[in-house]
Amino acid sequence: MTTAKHWTRGTKLNLERALKIGDELGGHIVAGHADGIATIVKRDDLPDMARFELRTTRELARFIAAKGSVTLDGVSLTVNTVQDVVFSVLIIPHTLNVTTLGGWRAGAEVNLEVDLMARYAARLAEMK
């Protein structure tokens, strides 16, 4: 399930060129495959950043860890805190200005891609 069903002509999306062999890997690996949806529970606008709390499914929450990585609406981010199925991210002003994240409000649904390495680690643990 993704938010694509709500897109219309003119909907702004976050797009990044694919990594080429030999390029520097400056973040975490993003496959571009949405695993599901997270719902914005709360937005706090702080002096030097915005803090978002998001809720996801229990199935996807098991792959999310504090200081780990998630991709939300195509933007690679570091998880700040996790409590059960709710997690938070901190967004700096530059990211708010150059992505669609600046327009996020409580109640909105966003695409969620969990960390690929966390997904693989969980699968390996299941197979033991």
Where on the chain are the PLM-derived regions?
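Conserved loop->alpha-helix
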Residues: 1-128
